Amino acid sequence: MARFFRRRKFCRFTAEGVKEIDFKDLNTLKAYISETGKIVPSRITGTKARYQRQLATAIKRARYLALLPYTDSHGR
């Protein structure tokens, strides 16, 4: 039986020394949104709690300003 070794999760924001997550940085935010438009939980991404809260707030602000969609595109 083959053993499955999961790669170690790490917080990208801590490693890069990010102080604040910006809602205008769409490339970063898109990496933490699923195909259906949901915010991916920190237990999957490995993001620390402090940055996960900032991430959620930034994604919600970007959605409110129509920079990011709330859901995936309907009808496809």
UniProtKB/Swiss-Prot annotation:
GO terms (BP aspect): translation
GO MF entry, a single one: small ribosomal subunit rRNA binding
CC annotations in GO: cytosolic small ribosomal subunit
Keyword entries, A-Z: Ribonucleoprotein, Ribosomal protein, RNA-binding, rRNA-binding
Signal peptide segment: none
The keyword Hydrolase is annotated on this UniProt entry: no
InterPro entries named in the record: Ribosomal_bS18, Ribosomal_bS18_CS, Ribosomal_bS18_sf
Function text: Binds as a heterodimer with protein bS6 to the central domain of the 16S rRNA, where it helps stabilize the platform of the 30S subunit.
Quaternary context: Part of the 30S ribosomal subunit. Forms a tight heterodimer with protein bS6.
Sequence similarity: Belongs to the bacterial ribosomal protein bS18 family.
Protein name (record): Small ribosomal subunit protein bS18
Organism: Azotobacter vinelandii (strain DJ / ATCC BAA-1303)
